[in-house]
C-alpha cells in the first residue's frame, strides 16, 4: 500500500494522517480485504463507487493499525480510545487519528465549486474571495475547512451562517476560522496541506 503519511500538530494537539489513492481494481481491493479475515462483512452497497470507498477505507484503517470503528447515530466514526475522522474524494481516501476531537476533509479543486458557492460562502467571505488570484482553489479550501469543522462537531452546522474562514493565501499551512452556532462560539486553527491534487484540511 502506497499511503502518504503525515505526523503533525497544531495548538499542542498532535495527529497522524494517512492518504491513499489505490490503483487496484475493485476485485483486487475485495481480495485484499477478504485475505485479512476480520469477520466484518461489507454492507450491501448498490453503487460501485461506494463499495470501492468502503473497501479502501477499511484497508487503510487496517494498514494504520485501526480496527473496525463504531459509528454514532449522526454517522461520525469513533474509536474506543482516541478520535478518528475519515474523508473521501473521487478515488482517494484519508483518515486522521488524534487523542482529541478532530475533523478531516479532502477536496480536489474544480470549477464546479461555483455551483455550490452560495450554500457555504458568506457575503463577508465572498468580499475577499471574489478577487482572489486562485479563486477556484481558494473556494475549495474554504469549503474543505467548513466540512472539517462540521465533522469536528458531527452535526448541526450551517456552513454559511455558523462558520467564517478568515482571509488566507492558498499555500498557508495554518488557517483561521470562527464558529458561532448551536455549539456556542470558538475559534479554530486549521491545519492545511496540498497533497497531490487534493486540498487537505484538519480541524482540531
Q: What are these model-predicted stretches?
A:
Residues 1-204:
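Core catalytic alpha/beta fold that binds nucleotide/phospho-ligands
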Amino acid at each position: 500500500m502506497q499511503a502518504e503519511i503525515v505526523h503533525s500538530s497544531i495548538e499542542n494537539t498532535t495527529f497522524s494522517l494517512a492518504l491513499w489513492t489505490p490503483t487496484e481494481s475493485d476485485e483486487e481491493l475485495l481480495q485484499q480485504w477478504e485475505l485479512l479475515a476480520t469477520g466484518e462483512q461489507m454492507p450491501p452497497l448498490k453503487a460501485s463507487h461506494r463499495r470501492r470507498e468502503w473497501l479502501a477505507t477499511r484497508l487503510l484503517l487496517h494498514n494504520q493499525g485501526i480496527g473496525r470503528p463504531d459509528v454514532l447515530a449522526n454517522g461520525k466514526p469513533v474509536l474506543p480510545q482516541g478520535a478518528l475522522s475519515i474523508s473521501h474524494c473521487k478515488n482517494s481516501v484519508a483518515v486522521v487519528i488524534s487523542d482529541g476531537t478532530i475533523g478531516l476533509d479532502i477536496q480536489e479543486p474544480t470549477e464546479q465549486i461555483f455551483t455550490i458557492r452560495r450554500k457555504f460562502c458568506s457575503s463577508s467571505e465572498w468580499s475577499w474571495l471574489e478577487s482572489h488570484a486562485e479563486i477556484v482553489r481558494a473556494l475549495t479550501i474554504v469549503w474543505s475547512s467548513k466540512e472539517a469543522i462540521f465533522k469536528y462537531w458531527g452535526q448541526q452546522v450551517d456552513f454559511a451562517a455558523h462558520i467564517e474562514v478568515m482571509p488566507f493565501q492558498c499555500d498557508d499551512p495554518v488557517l483561521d476560522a470562527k464558529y458561532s452556532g448551536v455549539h456556542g462560539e470558538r475559534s479554530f486553527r486549521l491545519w492545511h496541506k496540498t497533497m497531490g491534487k487534493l486540498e487537505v484540511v484538519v480541524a482540531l
